[in-house]
Amino acid sequence: MFIAINNTCHEQSTFSTYTSSGLVKNNLKESGFDYIKTKGFSKKRHMLSGNAVSKIKRNSLNKKVAVIGTGITGCTLSYMLAKKGIEVDLFEQSESICSGASSHELLVTYPRLSAHDSPFGRFNLQSYIYATNFYDNLETAAWKKTGVILLNHDESTQKRQSSLLEKRSDGEIYQYLNSDEASKISGIELKFNGLLYKDAGYILPNDLCRSLIDSPKINLFTSAEVKNISTMQDVTSFSVDEKIYEYEDVCLCTGSDTSKLLKIEGFNIKRGQVTHIETQDSILNINLPICAKGYISPQVNDLHIVGSSYSNEDHTKLTEEEHLSNLKNLKLIFDGDMVINSGKAGLRAVAKDHMPI
């Protein structure tokens, strides 16, 4: 462990310890650390402090990284790198950002949790908490922390929600709503009970991504289709319009296009189409996303987003079949007449077990 720590250090790395035991001192010395024994913290008599004996120079301030793709992943990664003082060259194959699966009018953010203590359940819970805190701290109007209601609409959902409520009843992550409570909170009459995820909501991806990459550390290249990625020793190169770019680190945030750039095992594409319906008096007051077999959003620019299909098709043309499927699923939430205005389709990158990539 001490060797692994030393391998991550540079010439200015320092450390301190709680303990000053012989075991720790011997391991520090053998693993390439210099130390001194000093007064301990609080009531502790002694502690150790020192530095790593390393010739590795700190170079992150002069580092430049290439990020390919300007969806939520690419823009968020660019933002995080820029916050660390790292310059980013951000490449987008289209004329404007968010041209792929992140191009939808809005994206609903909530977790798929498990009552069982599984890696999948823990990952989803921690991802959800991290994401909502991240969006909160951005203080951006592109994040709408409205809450999200998941309706208890069939036997499978009933079993899952009952298990979740048995596992956790403190209301911190989710809370039970009867149909009257769900109707009052959502702004529309609902016939099912369900769970409210109070810290969930939805994002406006285009606005969010523009705010994330608004930094002097981020250089945006649009209409820049990346080709011919190759790595030799510590340098990765690729071409854009026959010009060669070279970097120590290249990050592919390219979603369903990734398989065009690299050979990846177990990489699948799943199509998703959303339907934009015109608002009307009966749904005008919906003020948070409501999910059942499908979902409906609050109105954005006089439209509600209804989704989403999940098919094996590999194109992004709108189909009447998937529009009708979305509207059929919506009937569990709202069973009135709807007028289709438009829609949008994108391609998801998923593993064979449907986990997102």
Summary of predicted features, one role per range:
Residues 153-154, 181, 328-357:
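Flavin (FAD/FMN) cofactor-binding core of flavoprotein oxidoreductases
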Residues 15-16, 119-127, 153-157, 195-211, ...:
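Short beta-strand to alpha-helix junction loop
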